[in-house]
Curated annotation (Swiss-Prot):
UniProt entry keywords in alphabetical sequence: 4Fe-4S, Cytoplasm, Disulfide bond, Iron, Iron-sulfur, Metal-binding, Methyltransferase, rRNA processing, S-adenosyl-L-methionine, Transferase, tRNA processing
Sequence positions that bind [4Fe-4S] cluster: 123, 127, 130
Amino-acid positions noted as binding S-adenosyl-L-methionine in the UniProt annotation, renumbered to this chain: 173-174, 203, 226-228, 302
Primary site of residence: cytoplasm
Protein name per Swiss-Prot or TrEMBL: Dual-specificity RNA methyltransferase RlmN
Span of domain Radical SAM core: 109-340
Organism in which the protein naturally occurs: Helicobacter pylori (strain ATCC 700392 / 26695)
Active-site residues, Swiss-Prot/TrEMBL: 89 (proton acceptor), 345 (s-methylcysteine intermediate)
Superkingdom per UniProt: Bacteria
HAMAP family: RNA_methyltr_RlmN (MF_01849)
Catalyzed chemical reaction(s): adenosine(2503) in 23S rRNA + 2 reduced [2Fe-2S]-[ferredoxin] + 2 S-adenosyl-L-methionine = 2-methyladenosine(2503) in 23S rRNA + 5'-deoxyadenosine + L-methionine + 2 oxidized [2Fe-2S]-[ferredoxin] + S-adenosyl-L-homocysteine; adenosine(37) in tRNA + 2 reduced [2Fe-2S]-[ferredoxin] + 2 S-adenosyl-L-methionine = 2-methyladenosine(37) in tRNA + 5'-deoxyadenosine + L-methionine + 2 oxidized [2Fe-2S]-[ferredoxin] + S-adenosyl-L-homocysteine
GO cellular component, one term: cytoplasm
Amino acid sequence: MKASIYDFTLKELSQLLKPSFRAKQLYLWLYAKYKTSFKDMQNNFSKDFIAYLEREFALRTIEITHVRESVDGSKKYLFKSLRDNHTFEAVLLKMKDKKIDAETNAILEREKYTVCVSCQIGCQVGCSFCFTQKGGFVRNLKASEIIQQALLIKEDNNLPLEKALNIVFMGMGEPLNNLDEVCKAIEIFNTGMQISPKRITISTSGVADKIPILAGKNLGVQLAISLHAVDDKTRSSLMPLNKKYNIECVLNEVRKWPLEQRKRVMFEYLLIKDLNDSLDCAKKLLKLLNGIKSKVNLILFNPHEGSKFERPSLENARMFADFLNSKGLLCTIRESKALDIEAACGQLREKKLSQQI
C-alpha cells in the first residue's frame, strides 16, 4: 500500500514537493478543509500534480467503523486499519470550561474537547488493571494513524479548524514504546492541525530510560506518569514494568524533566478499593513526591469484564485528595467520563469487527 500523505511532516513535504510552497498548500487542504480525495484539491493544483499525488500517496488509511455515544456526550470510536484490518479505539471527551471575562468579570462557559488517542494496537506493558492488555500486543501505530484519529473525530463532529483540541496519549499503548511515531504525530498536530504542544499530554507507565530521550526532543508537551502505588511490591503487582523500572528509578528521571514556569508533572494514581486507597498511602505518596513540582490526578478504578479489582467509594477518594491538598500537594479527582460505554481510563482494547463496542 502507498505511503499515507499524513505520515509526512511539513518539512518533509517541502523537501519532497517542487516547488516547495506546494507543501503548505497541501497541508491546508489536508488539515483545514478535511479533503478526502486529491481530486477535491484541483482549485490549487494542476491535473498533472493531482495525478502525481494519486500515484505516490494514499489519503485515508483508517476508517471509522462504529461510534458509541455516552449519556455525558462523550464518544468512543472504533477505527479499522485499511492496511491490515486491525482495529483500535479512541475517545472524544466533552467537558465544560469556565473562564472569567476580563472586562465584565462574567463567567463564560464553553465546551472543551479532548481526544484520547491510541498509539499502539494492544500494549506490551501488561498492567493488571487495564483492559487493553487482555488483547495482547499487535503492532505500533504509524504517525498517520494517530493523526487520523483526531482528524476523523474532528470531522465527524463538524468542529471547525479554529476549535482547539486537547490531545492526550492515554488510549491504547505505551507512547514511549513507539516514540518516533508519537513525536512525528506531535509535530504534525502542531503544524497541521494547529494544536499547541501545551495542549498535548503524553502519559507513560514509566519507561524510565526513554523519558530523557523525550525530554531531549524539546517538544513542549505535558508529561504524565502512571504511578498507581506508593511501594514497589504493590506497583509491581499492578504494573510488571516496575520490576525493570522501579518507583525511584522513574522519579529520578522525572526530577530532570524540563518544566516551564508554573508547570507541573502530572502523576496519575488509580485508586483501587482496599489496595492503595488508604490515608496511609496518601501520606506515603506525599513523601514520595516531595521536592518534585507535581500534581496528582486520582482516578477511581473503572470496572471491566474479568477484572478482580473493585472501585473505591467517592468518599474515600475525597479523603485521599483532601489530605494531599491540605499538605500543599495539588490533587484532583478525575471525572469518569464515558463509563457507560466502556470508554473510560483503562477500558479500551482491540475489537474484532464482529464485536459491538
